[in-house]
Amino acid sequence: MVLLNESKVTKGLFSRYVRIQREGKYNMLMDAKQVMQLLGCDAVTYTDILNNYENYSKLYKKTVDNVATNIQVKIGNLLTSKTDVIGHQTNCKGIAGGLAGDVFKQHPECYEPYLQCCKINKPLGKTQLLKMNDGRVLANIFGQNEAGAATDYKMVLYALKDLKKQMDSLGLKSLSLPYGMGAGIGGGDWNEIFGLIEEVFGPTPIKVVLCKLEK
């Protein structure tokens, strides 16, 4: 298997490429720049995928066989998404910057319960569900302990599993997450985090929308 020595083609990235193909978003008329933008990768990584597609298909066979069609990327604002639940990654220190700051500014009724959860509980690796005034549910996904570039992949995985368990228990059928969750201020690798989202929600009937703001 001839792959680049320092390949950036992770399981999450390759599954995104396969999903684009299967959803019909990819066609030969698209230029490389458009495809790379959809994937969020550079030219070297994209070329690696093209040159070694069969090898990566074998390497990530289980992932390719189980690429979820219930996970979709859509252009739009997370805060206005019409799913049952909207989720975002949070820290355990009660510090709300970036998207979290926008969420709590628009839904101040959820801020104090978030602060109390940080003070009283040990929420790392868990998810707090809160009812918003508009009837939707907010999911505070505790994927990092500290504020800033502190995303912990293991805790993100645990928190996503906790979120799924709670959604199943409450009969909630759809979820919106920010495209790039935990990879902005949180400092994580989106390809890794995407792989975790797919691992938890891919095999389920829960509809997942990854909201990407149009540049």
Please annotate each region the language model reported.
Residues 1-67:
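An anion-engaging/catalytic patch
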